[in-house]
């Protein structure tokens, strides 16, 4: 059973629309992206490639394992590009879905610009890092380049903490799905002496 934000987001995503999904941690952003990417690449976008962009190598490895599990059900191959293995190139060449950091994908495009030509769908996870002074510029330039070269490519931006979701959605020409729903109640606590009091948020 889908969480409410997932149920709201999936029809938009599966229809091929660009989407900015701004919902709390653990409310199901990644599953929406995984289902959309696997479904569309196995159907409407057959023959195209999906790119799943994350900010950190550790997160790339995690998403790679998750996407492999879902994508294997529809016969799609997933590749990982984080620059740590000499054997990566063969899996990159054969992949239907490529999981990578923005820096690695930017480097790959500089070395082989033709990689951009078959992109059908892009997921940008932890999208609030667009505002990070060290990582943001690379991601922004990368997405601008993809949007310029592949105008029809679908873009899904995911974030739990982005502060200006409406403005970003407008920049991406994307549907904005914004919710504060959580699967569990969030509490804050105050400790005065030995007295601990919890308050729901």
At which residue positions do the language-model features occur?
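Conserved P-loop/Walker A NTP-binding site and adjacent catalytic elements of P-loop NTPases
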Residues: 2-192
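Alpha-helical transmembrane helix bundles of large polytopic membrane transport and channel proteins
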Residues: 191-201
